[in-house]
Amino acid sequence: MDRLLRIYNKEERLVVGLMSGTSADGIDAALVKVKGRGLDTKVELLEFEKFPYEEEVQKKIFELFDPHTGTVEKICHMNFLLGELFAEATLKLIKKAGLTPKDIDLIGSHGQTIYHIPNFIEDMGYKVRSTLQIGEPAVIAERTGIVTVADFRVRDVAAGGQGAPLVPYTEYILYRSPNETIALQNIGGIGNVTVLPKGGSIEDVIAFDTGPGNMVIDEVVKRITHGKMNFDKDGELASRGKVNEEFLAELLKDEFFKMKPPKTTGREHFGKNYVDNLMKKASYLEIDKYDLVATVTALTAYSVVRSYEKFIFPYYKVDKVVIGGGGSFNKTLVQMIKKQLPQVRVITQEDIGFNSDAKEAVAFAILASETINGNFNNIPKATGAKHPVVMGKISL
């Protein structure tokens, strides 16, 4: 415990944040200097790198997403294999920064989400929500020699929350403003928004998932290119097509878009089975491949904007929207969102000097630091939890 106490007493810490998102394309690793604690925390990004998964690793991860191929044996094995990969990424990042593991105080690892069940299931008299992230933190701690904080989401779920979104706590620390109301729109595999009312407290923050981000677009692109492309770089394919308005209207009837916040979603809803059905309908309608990419890109854009129109604009006058995540590099997608929000300034993380790719890795570095501080680091209004909790399990 002396080791934890030494870290606790430090006013300035070096923390590595690790993130592998729903796209499962690699590990985002950020080296962060964290000063202070609580809502007055100050953060400086010192180093960042993305470590892409080898094709074989990504294939094995995707097998875990499907209940038909994700056996207990495979999950058990991949939990430890991913722990090795997370540790390796950490050590490479530290070396790149010209430091040694002894210079680092903490690691905050999100892990890899394998399955997420945000809605209650009645079973044996219990109402149960659940979520599963792998990438064994004990392996990370063992290989690096660094205290590792991980498995954040389960504590929020245990308190009745959906275990997501978690980034709003850190977004309040980093982006809040006394002068303007800001909507932070992350577009990773799934899209999610955080609204920071001007001059508001952390209790005023609202956040929820808006629907698919890059997930459906990526899967459609893989299929129409027969695996030659994994995503639509710069939105180039979508820019060649025309949105099929009839099909888009059908897609927007999905029940998720009607749900009120707090709400979360994931690959369980908008993953392989969803795209299987989507491709069948597109084939029946004889939709051109470029038109199809344009249409599913519009699905993401429209789901974002409609979420604002239903759940944000009636209550807040948003001054600007800041888009982050991999979707911020999709020029066609960003342009679609801008076109539908002419009354709001729409910019990207890069426009304000932040790194879209690093954002979530930085967030888990901050959350880990707050775990050590013993501070609440969820926002119940965003996740639906009954009360604030300290998220994160510690491996020494």
Curated annotation (Swiss-Prot):
GO biological process terms on file: 1,6-anhydro-N-acetyl-beta-muramic acid catabolic process; amino sugar metabolic process; peptidoglycan turnover
Domain of life: Bacteria
EC number per UniProt: 2.7.1.170
Binding-site residues, ATP: 21-28
SUPFAM superfamilies in alphabetical order: Actin-like ATPase domain
Pathway where it operates: Amino-sugar metabolism; 1,6-anhydro-N-acetylmuramate degradation; Cell wall biogenesis; peptidoglycan recycling
Record's catalysed reaction(s): 1,6-anhydro-N-acetyl-beta-muramate + ATP + H2O = N-acetyl-D-muramate 6-phosphate + ADP + H(+)
GO molecular function, one term: phosphotransferase activity, alcohol group as acceptor
Keywords attached to this entry: ATP-binding, Carbohydrate metabolism, Kinase, Nucleotide-binding, Transferase
Enzyme type, top EC level: transferase
InterPro entries: Anhydro_N_Ac-Mur_kinase, ATPase_NBD
Keyword Transferase applies: yes
Pfam (any one): AnmK
Keyword Hydrolase: no
Function: Catalyzes the specific phosphorylation of 1,6-anhydro-N-acetylmuramic acid (anhMurNAc) with the simultaneous cleavage of the 1,6-anhydro ring, generating MurNAc-6-P. Is required for the utilization of anhMurNAc either imported from the medium or derived from its own cell wall murein, and thus plays a role in cell wall recycling.
Family membership noted in the UniProt record: Belongs to the anhydro-N-acetylmuramic acid kinase family.
PANTHER family, A to Z: ANHYDRO-N-ACETYLMURAMIC ACID KINASE
Entry protein name: Anhydro-N-acetylmuramic acid kinase
Underlying gene: anmK
